[in-house]
């Protein structure tokens, strides 16, 4: 068994990827790269806007900047290696590189799942207790929310990385995925993985199902508060406050829960790859668009930034 572990450590793995070199797949690969570029630029721009514009220094935008940072790190962890392997035709990844990719991926997905869940509490307080919002969502609370999201996500990532890399791998080293995804990697292990499967399921319940339950409970309370609002303008503002977050939640949790919480007998590598593309590339692109295009404050900050650049260039 040790011989196989050493061989895996030395030789690494092969990522079979999601694209072939057919004409159709070349078009799809180009589309993914466009999405990656938009995600990269959109999240970087949103982080800078929130940092530079004093009008966006509020709890909601602080959480949004952290969400954009997570999305930015997530796409940079997955897409560049996938693109390099596709363009070079090598498809290889080292054992250490695979472990690092797993650690970052699990940490970031877990952190984002928790942060989206805790952001629902922020929306609940904003709608249901607007007068107490500055007290209930003070700076210390905001730092605790983001800090706990990052901390638990990183702990989850380290646990799964150590557990996955500690298994013996023998026979085929071909991972049927476009990155080192834990469940695809486990299929190559020549040891009983039932304990790891249980650990993975427990982590998914804590990082996905529990925050999703918090979100549903928060929005049930928000709905009750909205129904009690008699002013049409206030009712519209309350819905606008929550709609962006609810859209992001649906996109992220829909794909992630489909990926990790459905029974194994319904799993197929092709389905897993498509679901992974959705929440590792598409969602990070859509989040900044959802929060900026539908938000007057962000668009206003962008216009002010462009005006400053234009005035500066004239001088």
From Swiss-Prot:
Q: Which GO terms describe its cellular component?
A: plasma membrane
* One Pfam family here: 7tm_4
What are the TM regions of this chain, as residue ranges? 32-52, 59-79, 100-120, 150-170, 199-219, 239-259, 273-293
Quick one: where is this thing mainly located?
A: membrane
What terms describe the molecular function in GO for this protein?
G protein-coupled receptor activity; olfactory receptor activity
Q: Using the chain's own numbering, where are the disulfide bonds?
A: 98-180
Q: Which SUPFAM superfamilies does UniProt cross-reference here? A: Family A G protein-coupled receptor-like
Residues glycosylated per entry: 6
Task: Set out the biological process GO terms recorded for this chain's protein.
Answer: detection of chemical stimulus involved in sensory perception of smell
The residue spans the entry assigns to the Extracellular side of the membrane are as follows 1-31, 80-99, 171-198, 260-272
Annotated keywords: Cell membrane, Disulfide bond, G-protein coupled receptor, Glycoprotein, Membrane, Olfaction, Receptor, Sensory transduction, Transducer, Transmembrane, Transmembrane helix
Location of the protein in the cell: Cell membrane
- Please indicate the ranges of residues that lie on the Cytoplasmic side: 53-58, 121-149, 220-238, 294-315
Protein family (similarity comment): Belongs to the G-protein coupled receptor 1 family.
**What function does this protein fulfil?**
Odorant receptor.
Q: Which PANTHER family does the entry link to? A: OLFACTORY RECEPTOR
- Protein name according to UniProt: Olfactory receptor 2V1
What's the name of its gene? OR2V1
């Amino acid at each position: 068994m040790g011989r196989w572990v050493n061989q895996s450590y030395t030789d690494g793995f092969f990522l079979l990827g999601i694209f072939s070199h057919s004409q159709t797949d070349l078009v799809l690969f180009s589309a993914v790269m466009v999405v990656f570029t938009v995600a990269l630029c959109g999240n970087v721009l949103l982080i800078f806007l929130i940092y530079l514009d004093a009008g966006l220094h509020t709890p909601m935008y602080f959480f949004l900047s952290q969400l954009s940072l997570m999305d930015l790190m997530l796409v940079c962890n997955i897409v560049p290696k996938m693109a390099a392997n596709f363009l070079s035709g090598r498809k290889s990844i080292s054992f250490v590189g695979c472990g690092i990719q797993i650690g970052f991926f699990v940490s970031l997905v877990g952190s984002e799942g928790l942060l989206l869940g805790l952001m629902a509490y922020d929306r609940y307080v904003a709608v249901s207790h607007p007068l107490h919002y500055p007290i209930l969502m003070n700076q210390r609370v905001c730092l605790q929310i983001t800090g706990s999201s990052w901390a638990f996500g990183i702990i989850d990532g380290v646990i799964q990385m150590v557990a996955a890399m500690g298994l013996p791998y023998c026979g085929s080293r071909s991972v049927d995925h476009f990155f080192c995804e834990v469940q695809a990697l486990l299929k190559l292990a020549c040891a009983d993985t039932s304990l790891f499967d249980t650990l993975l399921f427990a982590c998914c319940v804590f990082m996905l199902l529990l925050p999703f339950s918090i979100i549903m409970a928060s929005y049930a309370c928000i709905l009750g508060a909205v129904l009690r609002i008699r002013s049409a303008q206030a009712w519209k503002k309350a819905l606008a406050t929550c709609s962006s977050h609810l859209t992001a939640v649906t996109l992220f949790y829909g794909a992630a829960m489909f990926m990790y919480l459905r029974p194994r007998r319904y799993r197929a590598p092709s389905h897993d790859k498509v679901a992974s593309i959705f929440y590792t590339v598409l969602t990070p692109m859509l989040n900044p668009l959802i929060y900026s295009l539908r938000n007057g404050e962000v668009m206003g900050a962008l216009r002010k930034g462009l005006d400053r650049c234009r005035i500066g260039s004239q001088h």
